[in-house]
Each structure stands twice: as structure tokens, then as C-alpha cells.
Design a protein with these regions (language model features):
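Beta-sheet repeat architectures centered on beta-propellers
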Residues: 1-167
Length: 167
């Protein structure tokens, strides 16, 4: 977008792009800039936050095990019959380490017990709870969609956490 105007004559903001097209914003749920409708990649991502909220006196001393996510999302305004979003959880063992890594020596085994990072879960309109397996001191959260006709609003998700070890 190269130029914008908030016009009182029209109800939506108007922008011009580099292909000499006028784009009307905040109208509909898809990208209609061309004749071929495209989905809008919409997301919101948190910064890192401590998993063990009750660990106020010894902040960061305990690992937390997130075993359930209670999503709070609505799909008001969606134009498809089964809208969905993806919720991704990014665990961090220590500040400054990469997401999903640990500073412990790996267990030697013929099986791969590692969980992918991020852990992604599909959430639909009537998803009441999502069972997870996530361990760490901190985590970040991302909610996104990339499908045509999907509009969503994120509320306050809740997580069920158990204390899971100490450093």
C-alpha cells in the first residue's frame, strides 16, 4: 500500500497500491484485490510468558506441564459453514534458548519421543478443550487462519498446568 485516506464520504478506509488499484479496507473477510479471491493470513502472537503463574516467590524455578487448552475464540462474521483457526504453542525451557529445546542430554533410544515445535492444534466453533503435552518454564502462543471466508475474534484462553519438576 502506498497511500491511504480515511474518507468521511465513504464508510471504509481506502488505500492505493503500486498497481494503481484502489483497495477498500475493513469490508468483507477475504482479499479481493484481484479477480481471484484469496484468504487473508490473519494472526496474533504473544510474547513469552511464564507457565507457572503461581510460582511468584521463586519465579522460574519450576517447570510447568500444560496438559489442556481451553480456547476462547468466536467466528462471528465468517462466511463458511465450518470456520477454523490453528493455535500454536511454543514452549521454552530457559530464557534465551530456542523454542522446544532442552539443555539436558538426550535419551538414547531407537524411538523418537520429541514433540514438534510448535505444537499446533485445530480449533473450530464448538471445540471445548484441546489436550496438549507441553513442558517448559515459558511459552508463547499464536492463533492464525489462512482459509477463505474465515473471520474470528480471540478472547482469553485458559490453560490447565501442573508443576513438573524443578531446576
Amino acid at each position: 500500500r502506498s497511500a491511504w485516506i480515511q474518507n468521511n464520504i465513504q464508510s471504509n478506509p481506502v488505500a492505493a497500491d503500486y498497481n494503481n488499484r484502489l483497495l477498500y479496507h475493513e469490508s468483507g473477510v477475504d482479499d479481493n484485490a484481484t479477480s481471484n479471491t484469496q484468504p487473508i493470513y490473519a494472526y496474533i502472537q504473544s510474547s513469552d510468558f511464564g507457565i507457572m503463574a503461581s510460582d511468584q516467590n521463586n519465579s522460574g524455578q519450576h517447570f510447568g506441564f500444560v496438559w489442556r487448552l481451553l480456547p476462547d475464540v468466536n467466528f462471528n462474521g465468517s462466511t463458511v459453514s465450518n470456520p477454523q483457526v490453528t493455535m500454536a504453542l511454543y514452549p521454552r525451557q530457559n530464557s534465551g534458548t530456542a523454542y522446544g529445546t532442552t539443555d539436558l542430554n538426550p535419551v538414547v533410544s531407537s524411538q523418537n519421543y520429541a514433540f514438534p515445535t510448535p505444537q499446533e492444534y485445530t480449533v473450530q466453533q464448538f471445540t471445548g478443550e484441546v489436550y496438549t503435552r507441553l513442558r517448559g518454564r515459558q511459552m508463547a502462543f499464536k492463533c492464525y487462519s489462512d482459509t477463505i471466508g474465515t473471520a474470528w475474534q480471540l478472547g482469553t484462553n485458559r490453560y490447565d498446568v501442573k508443576q513438573d519438576g524443578r531446576r
